[in-house]
């Protein structure tokens, strides 16, 4: 058989095999189109589980007459126009395949009217070449899509449809998920002429718990803990059920959204499960309704035919952010109120985990802000409940203010007691000295500095090593351990196992958590400066170092680790150098006063100036 271009109908049917799995898939695609059109009311009529009829009517912006034929063509869309748009998608649909694919396996009719038009127009595709016919019709502003006799021309696909009840249950679940994503939209669902679901729009700032309770049940609402967790361009909002009261029925409630798009993502589920694992049994699952907002440039939604999955460009960052957000809510349940007496309250040892330098924990920082209202509160019982924090109902991404981002990155100052705000002092009030101003980068890893008219060279790798040693050295409290996404399992000798067991308490202070069995050791958590390292190389070297020691001091181990960490910067930039020096000045002020050998070298310009003048 020679190579030939497939007929449009055949090509569309092949595409429909990926997009149109069952009637619920059709409902999902069409309702998402309505939401992208700005609809505030969507009516969904289903007959015989969607096999006979699926009708979606909305009050969105509508489609112009001259664009109706394009709407039923493949790869025609108003959502994106360039590669840049594809890399920062904020709409639910973008491929332009859904209507063409659905019309190839059903009798689809599209009726629409825009506010500028005096009359509505109806379009449908038919024939082998999928030619589109357009004719006048009566219709208010908005769009109606009717899908009749789904899979009528593909008997094999129609044969594998389940019972009417099962197919409608799948549609009902899709509508529940969409209703949880858009509280600002009224959604009505009917089956065989009977209204089954009515979700009324909630006004801005109104009560969201009524719809949450209607979809997830009062049992979930009574155990729900509200989350509002933010860092820079990442925001996590929603609810997670108290794991101490999770039941098998509640465990079925697992709804996750990324930039308003409903998602089934293993990375997100793993982060939530890991945060709850200490309170859940081996056979239990957490219950949650969570909304993640992220810079659209940092997530790829074009990786799954039905757009059920996404890929994060910085998956570990997102995982740790969600883990810390959920964990903070659960820990808040166990903490007592902050005392308000006159005794000084020690600030949490968060300095090593809140540095701007590479390897820091961007998210272990509830104390890194000025005192504000709680960002998360347990949802009260039904009745007279105040409105819980809720993500913006409108889809899309909004950049956070730069000032807020800067405040989130500040290191918390030791807190003596709660009192009226006073004028803030400079961050280095007790150590007003600094290395100076960064002029440029020399030989890729040295910073040329100017201070009080003097010029000096600073070795950035050496400064980074001192910073990491300070981050790793425990103070009054152990260094915060961060669980690994995938624990590292290594085979060890009897001598190495014995050394590890002797050093276990010292390693725990450094944030290194492990479990050992007969011949293996499993590294479960490491401090943040180690998260970006190649642990397959570093940990065996650390075990070899410990096997040669007889005394295990956390400070000595931290020094060894700092000296053996690989630098993340083969070529340093000005911004990276400035950030590093700011961290060193705050965390290691003694280096400014008495720089160790190999860190700082003054540069004498007088001979060069003299030579120029002599010329």
Swiss-Prot record:
One Gene Ontology MF term: ATP binding
Any one GO cellular component localisation term in the record: mismatch repair complex
GO process terms (BP): mismatch repair
Span list, region Disordered: 363-397
Keyword DNA repair part of the UniProt annotation: yes
Alphabetized SUPFAM superfamilies for the sequence: ATPase domain of HSP90 chaperone/DNA topoisomerase II/histidine kinase, DNA mismatch repair protein MutL, Ribosomal protein S5 domain 2-like
Keyword DNA repair: yes
InterPro entries found in the cross-reference section: DNA_mismatch_repair_CS, DNA_mismatch_repair_MutL, DNA_mismatch_S5_2-like, HATPase_C_sf, MutL/Mlh/PMS, MutL/Mlh/Pms-like, MutL_C, MutL_C_dimsub
Keyword vocabulary terms for this entry: DNA damage, DNA repair
Pfam families per the UniProt record, alphabetical: DNA_mis_repair, HATPase_c_3, MutL_C
Composition bias type Low complexity, residue spans: 364-391
Membership in a protein family: Belongs to the DNA mismatch repair MutL/HexB family.
NCBIfam families reported for this sequence: mutl (TIGR00585), PRK00095.1-1 (NF000948)
Role noted for this protein: This protein is involved in the repair of mismatches in DNA. It is required for dam-dependent methyl-directed DNA mismatch repair. May act as a 'molecular matchmaker', a protein that promotes the formation of a stable complex between two or more DNA-binding proteins in an ATP-dependent manner without itself being part of a final effector complex.
Full protein name: DNA mismatch repair protein MutL
């Amino acid at each position: 058989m020679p190579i030939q271009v497939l007929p449009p109908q055949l090509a569309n049917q092949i595409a429909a095999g990926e997009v149109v799995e069952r009637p619920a898939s059709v409902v999902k695609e069409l309702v998402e189109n309505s939401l992208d059109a700005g609809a505030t009311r969507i009516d969904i009529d289903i007959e015989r589980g969607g096999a006979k009829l699926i009708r979606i009517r909305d009050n969105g912006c509508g489609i112009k007459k001259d664009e109706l034929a394009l709407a039923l063509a493949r790869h025609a869309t108003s959502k994106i126009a360039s590669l840049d748009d594809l890399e920062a998608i904020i709409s639910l649909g973008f491929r332009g395949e859904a209507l063409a694919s659905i019309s190839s396996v059903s009798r689809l009719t599209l009726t629409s009217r825009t506010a500028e038009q005096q009359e509505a127009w109806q379009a449908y595709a038919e024939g082998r070449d999928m030619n589109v016919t357009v004719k006048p019709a009566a219709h208010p502003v908005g769009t109606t899509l009717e899908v009749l006799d789904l899979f009528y021309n593909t008997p094999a696909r129609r044969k594998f449809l389940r019972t009417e009840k099962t197919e409608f249950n799948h549609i009902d679940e899709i509508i529940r998920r969409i209703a949880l994503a858009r509280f600002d939209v009224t959604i009505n669902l009917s089956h065989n002429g009977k209204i089954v679901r009515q979700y009324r729009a909630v006004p801005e700032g109104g009560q969201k718990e009524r719809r949450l309770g209607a979809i997830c049940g009062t049992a979930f609402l009574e155990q729900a803990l509200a989350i509002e967790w933010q860092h820079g361009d990442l925001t996590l909002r929603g609810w997670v059920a108290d794991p101490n009261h999770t039941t098998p029925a509640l465990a079925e409630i697992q709804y996750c959204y990324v930039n308003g798009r409903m998602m089934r993502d293993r990375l997100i589920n793993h982060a939530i499960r890991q945060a709850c694992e200490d309170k859940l049994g081996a056979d239990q699952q957490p219950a949650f309704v969570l909304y993640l907002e992220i810079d659209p440039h940092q997530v790829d939604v074009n990786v799954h035919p039905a757009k059920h999955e996404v890929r994060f460009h910085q998956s570990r960052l997102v995982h740790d952010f969600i883990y810390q957000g959920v964990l903070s809510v659960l820990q808040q349940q166990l903490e007592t109120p902050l005392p308000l007496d006159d005794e000084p309250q020690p600030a949490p040892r968060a300095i090593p985990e809140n540095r701007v330098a590479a390897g820091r924990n961007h998210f272990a920082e509830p104390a890194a802000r000025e005192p504000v209202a709680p960002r998360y509160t347990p949802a009260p019982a039904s009745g007279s409940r105040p409105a819980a924090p809720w993500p913006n109902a409108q889809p899309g991404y909004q950049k956070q203010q730069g000032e807020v981002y800067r405040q989130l990155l500040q290191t918390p100052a030791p807190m003596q007691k709660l009192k009226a705000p006073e004028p803030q002092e400079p961050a280095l009030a007790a150590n007003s000295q600094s290395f100076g101003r960064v002029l440029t980068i020399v030989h890729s890893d040295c910073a040329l500095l100017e201070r009080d008219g003097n010029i000096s060279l600073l070795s950035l790798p050496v400064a980074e090593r001192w910073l990491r040693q300070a981050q790793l050295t425990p103070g009054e409290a152990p260094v915060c351990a961060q669980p690994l996404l995938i624990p590292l399992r290594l085979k060890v000798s009897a001598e190495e196992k014995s050394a590890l067991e002797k050093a276990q308490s010292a390693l725990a202070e450094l944030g290194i958590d492990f479990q050992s069995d007969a011949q293996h050791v499993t590294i479960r958590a490491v401090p943040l400066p180690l998260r970006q390292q190649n642990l397959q190389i570093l940990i065996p070297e650390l075990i070899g170092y410990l096997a040669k020691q007889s005394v295990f001091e956390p400070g000595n181990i931290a020094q060894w680790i700092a000296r053996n960490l690989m630098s993340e910067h083969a070529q340093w930039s000005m911004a990276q150098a400035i950030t590093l020096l700011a961290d060193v000045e705050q965390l290691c002020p003694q280096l400014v006063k008495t720089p160790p050998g190999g860190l700082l070298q003054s540069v004498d310009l007088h001979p060069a100036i003299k030579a120029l003048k002599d010329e």
